[in-house]
């Protein structure tokens, strides 16, 4: 049975998609079979754009599971929160469908990297948020952060809410992009590294290379 990691971020557009592809490639280079899954994609049609980015970073073609919609069971046209995108198309996002797709992938691969939509508390239907989904499944989390102003606050809030829900954090991925104020960026990286060493020593701290996609 595959190991499932859930990739989320401290904010929208923090680099979850790039980080998911990067981490998948890293595991592949260690000899593992890896597939990425997008929980829900908004703002596109057809095959999820984030999956295309994952495959490009991994250096592989689209898989049969991509073409069958297993790696992204819900794609919506309007670029907004999943619950609103579904409402606009008069559709319902059902947790069971996402779970079934993940289970199918787990039968074939060593690792499934499941990328969420937005941050931890984004609603995916009228009743449930991403955090609720995580609490139900207890997938270990890979949290993506960066060095932009405000990231320390957002990262600590995310870590603390995950801890309060007893959801384990496997790793924090530090995204070097965008290259902003280097004084702030370097201090953010050092602060977060020290914080994890003190309060969450089993959580890995990974610095992601700058990637051009």
From Swiss-Prot:
A single GO molecular function term of this UniProt record: magnesium ion binding
Cofactor(s) needed for function: Mg(2+)
Residues holding ATP: 13-18, 50, 115-118
Residues noted as binding Mg(2+) in the record, renumbered to the chain: 17, 50, 115
Entry-linked HAMAP family: BioD
NCBIfam families cross-referenced by the UniProt entry: bioD
Family, as annotated: Belongs to the dethiobiotin synthetase family.
Function per UniProt: Catalyzes a mechanistically unusual reaction, the ATP-dependent insertion of CO2 between the N7 and N8 nitrogen atoms of 7,8-diaminopelargonic acid (DAPA, also called 7,8-diammoniononanoate) to form a ureido ring.
Record's subunit section: Homodimer.
Protein name: ATP-dependent dethiobiotin synthetase BioD 2
Encoding gene per record: bioD2
């Amino acid at each position: 049975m595959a190991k499932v990691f859930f990739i989320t971020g401290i904010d929208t557009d923090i680099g979850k998609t790039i980080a998911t592809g990067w981490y998948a490639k890293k595991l592949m280079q260690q000899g593992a079979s890896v597939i990425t899954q997008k929980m829900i994609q908004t703002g596109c049609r057809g095959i999820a754009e984030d999956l295309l980015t994952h495959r490009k970073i991994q250096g592989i073609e689209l898989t049969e599971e991509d073409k069958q919609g297993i790696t992204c069971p819900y794609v919506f046209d309007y670029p907004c929160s999943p619950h609103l995108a579904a409402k606009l198309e008069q559709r319902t996002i059902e947790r069971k469908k996402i779970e079934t797709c993940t289970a199918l992938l787990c039968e074939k691969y060593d690792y499934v990297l499941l990328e969420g939509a937005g941050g931890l508390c984004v609603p995916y239907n009228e009743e449930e948020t991403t955090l609720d989904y995580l609490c139900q499944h207890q997938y270990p989390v890979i949290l993506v952060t960066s060095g932009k102003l405000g990231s320390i606050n957002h990262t600590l809030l995310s870590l603390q809410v995950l801890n309060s829900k007893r959801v384990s954090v496997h790793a924090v991925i530090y995204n070097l992009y965008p290259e902003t104020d280097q004084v702030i960026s370097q201090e953010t990286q050092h602060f977060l590294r020290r914080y994890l060493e003190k309060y969450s020593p089993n959580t890995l701290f990974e610095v992601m290379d700058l990637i051009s996609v």
